[in-house]
């Protein structure tokens, strides 16, 4: 079995352009081709900018990722989360700034607990 590749890069600030560059370099270094639909699941455990501002992925990171994907011609992008506290994830997504990001980028943001689900058989799926 092939060992997985892991890329670690330093980013000194939450700057979407710098993050986009790191993601671009990483995609190139891994030899990836990205096409089709892309689902981005940031980690939004909770969000409270006053008390626990480090319990979610900063939306600027996701903005950089969205920019990189759009640069590659990906147009079907969705951001979604399903929190585990019993509190609607949309509240955390809003507090964290993901709905503002959606307005800025045109990428929809969904709460997976409130969104319609559909079973899809992956006929060409491969276990990694």
Question: Model-flagged regions — what are they?
Answer:
Residues 1-128:
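N-terminal and secondary-structure boundary signal
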